[in-house]
Amino acid sequence: MVKFALQFKASLENLTQLRPHGEDFRWFLKLKCGNCGEVSDKWQYITLMDSVPLKGGRGSASMVQRCKLCSRENSIDILAASLHPYNAEDSETFKTIVEFECRGLEPIDFQPQAGFAAEGAETGTPFHEINLQEKDWTDYDEKAKESVGIYEVEHRFTKC
């Protein structure tokens, strides 16, 4: 079992507390089999709500799958306690926002999509359903009378 951290980096304009919103947030990942090196050609998603039992009664995971090439059963689990918001003071630096516990799988790519939420840095104005698929997002904070945005989104995986 290996833990991988998803580190996130972005430039935040007048925003803080950027985070995945809700237990149904979809983490879209590309995964590699640790046994044979096969990489999934399609994006796969996992959520905190997903729970699949592991063989042999060893607990559960967010996703269990059998490798198409070598037939090995692999799993990945979201570690709920590792979820952290990306704040204004984190802007333009890499910060771990979630960790995954992997058995036989390695996450190699992440595709941010809809489902993020944030707050206005000065006003606390909530912004929901932020879509980061284009790596940029903008809106307007009526209370502060200023633009808000998320720019230059980057990510990387590191072993914990």
From Swiss-Prot:
Keyword Zinc: yes
Keywords tagged on the record: Metal-binding, Zinc
Domain notes from UniProt: The N-terminal and the C-terminal half of the protein have a very similar 3D-structure, suggesting they arose from duplication. Requires a bound zinc ion for normal folding and solubility.
Sample GO molecular function, one term: zinc ion binding
Name of this chain's protein: CXXC motif containing zinc binding protein
Pfam families linked to this entry: CXXC_Zn-b_euk (PF05907)
Assigned protein family: Belongs to the UPF0587 family.
Cited PANTHER family: CXXC MOTIF CONTAINING ZINC BINDING PROTEIN
Gene name per UniProt: czib
Coiled-coil regions listed in the entry: none
Annotated residues for binding of Zn(2+): C33, C36, C67, C70
